Amino acid sequence: MSYITTSKLSRRRIRNRKRVLIVNCYFDYTRLSVPRPFKSPQAMAPVYLAGAFSDELVDIRLYNEQSSGPLEDENLLSWPDMLVLTGLTSAFDRMLHLTAYARTKNTNVIVVAGGSPIRAIPNYSQRFFDYCCCGDIEQMNEVITDAFGEDYVAREMLPRYDLAYWTRRFGYIETSRNCNFRCPFCALTGEGVGYQKYDLEYIRKQIIAMGKKKYVIFIDNNFYGNDRKFFLERLDLIKDMRKAGYLRSWAALVTTDFFHKDENLELVRDAGCLGLFTGIEAFDTQWLQNNKAQNAHFPQVELISKSLDAGVVFHYGLIMDV
């Protein structure tokens, strides 16, 4: 390729560059305008979505309202050609706010919304957003192709950890998607999605792209899953990456069936696991039985003690505290 041709190509790329702002929308549980930079885990959907865009043709900025508080920067809201919004179900109204603000600054801005809020009310959402995405993050590729053209889609979709200003000492990795259980009170059950495993090489690439971190949190809905071979393969991969210096300790979310095999605690501890989170849901056994919590293990206090005795910190959530 000649120098002149290269220059023309460079000028054309500069002229055709797009600007994309990806926001994790967040309503704090206190309903106050406060940042939660030390809350864990932090939202990572914007980081994964950013990986869908070509870094050669797209300037990307990320904003996490969970970590940084409500987005109120008028200059930032007027900047993008495309505004991509994601978040938890409770953030739907916040999506509406940001859409209205952005359109007052730029009437031509393309607004893309996805995640749990859109899957919960897909038809209603179409009144407000240009693109309503009910699928997984890969659907972003289709949106980019339709809105900008296929040249603006990344050759390989890897999370853009370099843009994740809020992660600090922590790294966040996803090795699987959704859950193999169907508890009636769970949002994943309502969405009707199935458990999906990631390719081990893709997991390795995520860790390398993340860079070296002291602590890593695996943000899988269920790190244990229903495939023991896959579980053991990931532990071996984690050991390899620890030896290479990419992480020192890690934590993950598992369902309580993980604790049925005593050896599991030894396996994760030997792989550098610092702590596990699981849904105790309630200390009322009758309530759990009535609500058909499929992964419940009794008695709950014994389960907690077993984890602590093995040297693994036990974190748990409650739906009902009595």
Region roles according to the model:
Residues 158-315, 320-322:
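Radical SAM [4Fe-4S] cluster-binding motif and immediate context
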Residues 2-211, 215-217:
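Acidic, low-complexity intrinsically disordered segments
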